[in-house]
């Protein structure tokens, strides 16, 4: 089968940084145990399973407040998606050592919200309800930030403040964000616009928009919880006009999808491990619709191949608790 490997695809620097921080934490014997991650360090279950093998426990819950309530002692790692100041304070009050793996692009948005809310602005934040990144960003200034996900949310906004600003979750579809920002500019002509789609998200989406049209089908390799992976599927269908499926790994591929397909494109979300993507590409490369021996799907990538290798462990930056 013809396989079009869309570039760039896979890991972004924020994800790699977060994983390296967590791996160094696992190797740092001075950190109080147990070591917990507040939610998925990045939205990929293969990664969180690999960290469990490393002795780092991923805690789950509806929100970060609910998750940190589960922790009584040890060390907590804040995920790449960022956390609110309230969570940082609770960690300190509980006597926990904290490690911050927030993506630098998310920190930029937090700084913007902090600065503008102090100047008296109301901030409209375009993001996905229930996702940890908006939760952390809104928590920077809860009384000033208003989450919108759709045109209906914009219709129901009732803001009279002359100081208005719009920003967004870094992993949204850039076309959705542009559309919603246009609607906001119509409703509030004086609004200041700060588009914060991270570069990694942007270039991956643009690559799909430009290249997926050359194929009959696009396979996106990414976790179901990964917003940027799900957006790549959306971009393929809505912008490139190419049908698309998202799979967590090769075991989720369906042979029926490949019947009658001459050329398949492959990309991956920013938190998808490279070996997982390579395994999908290898399967598609050897696939022949008329040869049943090429239809056997088996995942062989083991957890020890998932995380970045650390040759020289480095001490992690610790945020110490209140004495």
Curated annotation (Swiss-Prot):
Keyword Iron applies: yes
Enzyme kind, highest EC tier: oxidoreductase
Binding site for (2E)-4-hydroxy-3-methylbut-2-enyl diphosphate: 43, 81, 131, 170, 226, 228, 271
GO MF term list: 4 iron, 4 sulfur cluster binding; 4-hydroxy-3-methylbut-2-enyl diphosphate reductase activity; metal ion binding
Pfam annotation, one family: LYTB
GO BP of this protein: dimethylallyl diphosphate biosynthetic process; isopentenyl diphosphate biosynthetic process, methylerythritol 4-phosphate pathway; terpenoid biosynthetic process
UniProt-annotated binding residues for [4Fe-4S] cluster: 12, 103, 198
Coiled coil: none
Recorded catalytic activity of this chain's protein: isopentenyl diphosphate + 2 oxidized [2Fe-2S]-[ferredoxin] + H2O = (2E)-4-hydroxy-3-methylbut-2-enyl diphosphate + 2 reduced [2Fe-2S]-[ferredoxin] + 2 H(+); dimethylallyl diphosphate + 2 oxidized [2Fe-2S]-[ferredoxin] + H2O = (2E)-4-hydroxy-3-methylbut-2-enyl diphosphate + 2 reduced [2Fe-2S]-[ferredoxin] + 2 H(+)
Annotated pathway: Isoprenoid biosynthesis; dimethylallyl diphosphate biosynthesis; dimethylallyl diphosphate from (2E)-4-hydroxy-3-methylbutenyl diphosphate: step 1/1; Isoprenoid biosynthesis; isopentenyl diphosphate biosynthesis via DXP pathway; isopentenyl diphosphate from 1-deoxy-D-xylulose 5-phosphate: step 6/6
Residues annotated for isopentenyl diphosphate binding in this entry: 43, 81, 131, 226, 228, 271
Main function: Catalyzes the conversion of 1-hydroxy-2-methyl-2-(E)-butenyl 4-diphosphate (HMBPP) into a mixture of isopentenyl diphosphate (IPP) and dimethylallyl diphosphate (DMAPP). Acts in the terminal step of the DOXP/MEP pathway for isoprenoid precursor biosynthesis.
Family membership: Belongs to the IspH family.
Official protein name in the record: 4-hydroxy-3-methylbut-2-enyl diphosphate reductase
Provenance organism: Lysinibacillus sphaericus (strain C3-41)
């Amino acid at each position: 089968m013809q396989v079009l490997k869309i570039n760039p695809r896979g890991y972004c620097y924020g994800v790699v940084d977060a994983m390296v921080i967590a791996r160094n934490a696992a190797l740092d014997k001075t950190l109080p145990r147990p070591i917990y991650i507040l939610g998925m360090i990045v939205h990929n279950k293969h990664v969180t399973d690999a960290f469990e093998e490393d002795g780092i426990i991923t805690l789950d819950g509806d929100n970060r407040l609910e998750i940190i309530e589960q922790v009584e002692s040890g060390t907590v790692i804040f995920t790449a998606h960022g956390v609110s100041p309230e969570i940082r304070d609770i960690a300190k009050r509980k006597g926990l050592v904290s490690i911050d793996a927030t993506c630098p692009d998310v920190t930029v948005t937090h700084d913007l919200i902090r600065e503008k809310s102090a100047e008296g602005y109301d901030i409209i934040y375009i993001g996905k309800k229930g996702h940890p990144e908006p939760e952390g960003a809104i928590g920077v200034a809860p009384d000033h930030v208003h989450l919108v996900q759709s045109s209906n949310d914009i219709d129901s906004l009732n803001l009279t403040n002359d100081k208005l600003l719009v920003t967004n979750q870094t992993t949204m579809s850039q076309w959705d964000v542009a559309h919603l920002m246009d609607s906001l500019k119509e409703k509030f002509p004086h609004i200041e616009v700060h588009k914060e789609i991270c570069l990694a998200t942007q270039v991956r989406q643009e690559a799909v928009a430009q290249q997926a049209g050359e194929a009959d089908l696009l396979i996106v390799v990414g976790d179901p919880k990964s917003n940027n992976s799900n957006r790549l599927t959306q971009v393929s269908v809505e912008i490139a006009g190419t049908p698309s499926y998202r799979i967590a790994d090769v075991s989720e591929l369906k042979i029926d999808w490949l019947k009658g397909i001459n050329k398949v494109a492959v990309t991956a979300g920013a938190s998808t491990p490279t070996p997982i993507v390579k395994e999908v590409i290898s399967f598609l490369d050897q696939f022949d619709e008329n040869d049943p021996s090429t239809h056997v799907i088996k995942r062989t990538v083991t957890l020890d191949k998932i995380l970045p290798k650390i040759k020289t462990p480095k001490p992690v930056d610790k945020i110490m608790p209140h004495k």
